[in-house]
Amino acid sequence: MPLDGVKNIVLVLSGKGGVGKSSVTLQLALALTLQGKSVGILDIDLTGPSIPRLVGLEDAKITQSPAGWVPVPVHSATDNATGPATGSLRCISLGFLLRDRGDAVIWRGPKKTAMIRQFLSDVSWGETDYLLVDTPPGTSDEHIALAEQLLTTATTDAAAAAAGGRPRLAGAVLVTTPQAIATSDVRKEVNFCVKTRIPTLGVIENMSGYACPCCGEVSNIFSSGGGRAMAQEMGIKFLGVVPVDVKFGELVEGGKIQDGSDSEDEGETARQEPEPEAVDDRPLVERYKDCWSYPRFEEFARTLIADIDGA
């Protein structure tokens, strides 16, 4: 059965490119994992897959099992005796199937549609509480194929999903930046959800301000509040704002997260030999908790869990 073992499916959508859908998808996944949920990420941005890079596994490859394709593991579930348990995190992306990470994907619509259908039917996810689907911008062939396939194999009705053992298409999280050019395109994505009868779970206003890496204070460099205003106007739940987080950027780029502290005597520091940086070998899930944006996504994750599981 397609998506066997998957309980809830959440789409991450935006009508505009460059608003941070992939980073929002990953941070939601990490936050849900830290809530003890088993999470999968399905990256259907076929021409620009970002998830392999964000999780630091660009050289990983998808393996085959009798049950189907096996997702690439990012984090294994843990049962901590001294702290809260964490769930597992796995992901699937076309980036894991490319011969070389620099290969361009130049496909027409029918081939994209076939690939998405294969992702939704041939992957052995196992027991997965939440499957987050990272989508490309706009409403293209990928979105149409995704909606058609999910509305056939899954259901938006919680009672029907529980009774029939089918996955539940819980809804879509819409991502925008504060600027009007982004919110105007997200309105089209809302219209897409209405026409396809996919519920909307809420709006996240990403890149809303800049979080200082030293103290965490948020400064509104550009405009702010556009996502909230759009959500209120369209009657959609507003989940919250996320500022630009330098620490998260350092995390996904493979660098060490800096604590933001500087030496009082710069001249003395310049004369000293630099000490080798200690390698932080903690799992990605644990390192993410050091990011300024984590408390915000922790709140988003709890809200989604309450809205979806409580429905």
From Swiss-Prot:
It is found in: Cytoplasm. Its cofactor is [4Fe-4S] cluster. It holds the Pfam family ParA. Residues 268-281 have a biased composition (Basic and acidic residues). ATP binds at residues 15-22. InterPro entries: Mrp/NBP35_ATP-bd, NUBP2/Cfd1_eukaryotes, P-loop_NTPase, YlxH/NBP35. SUPFAM superfamilies: P-loop containing nucleoside triphosphate hydrolases. Residues 255-281 are annotated as: Disordered. Binds 4 [4Fe-4S] clusters per heterotetramer. Contains two stable clusters in the N-termini of nbp35 and two labile, bridging clusters between subunits of the nbp35-cfd1 heterotetramer. Disulfide bonds: none annotated. It comes from the Eukaryota. The keyword Cytoplasm applies. GO terms for molecular function: 4 iron, 4 sulfur cluster binding; ATP binding; ATP hydrolysis activity; ATP-dependent FeS chaperone activity; metal ion binding. GO terms for cellular component: cytosolic [4Fe-4S] assembly scaffold complex. The keyword Cytoplasm applies. [4Fe-4S] cluster binds at residues 212, 215. Keywords: 4Fe-4S, ATP-binding, Cytoplasm, Iron, Iron-sulfur, Metal-binding, Nucleotide-binding. One of its GO terms (biological process) is iron-sulfur cluster assembly. HAMAP family: Mrp_NBP35, NUBP2. Heterotetramer of 2 nbp35 and 2 cfd1 chains. Belongs to the Mrp/NBP35 ATP-binding proteins family. NUBP2/CFD1 subfamily. Component of the cytosolic iron-sulfur (Fe/S) protein assembly (CIA) machinery. Required for maturation of extramitochondrial Fe-S proteins. The nbp35-cfd1 heterotetramer forms a Fe-S scaffold complex, mediating the de novo assembly of an Fe-S cluster and its transfer to target apoproteins. This is Cytosolic Fe-S cluster assembly factor cfd1. It comes from Aspergillus terreus (strain NIH 2624 / FGSC A1156). The lineage of its organism: Eukaryota, Fungi, Dikarya, Ascomycota, Pezizomycotina. The gene is cfd1.
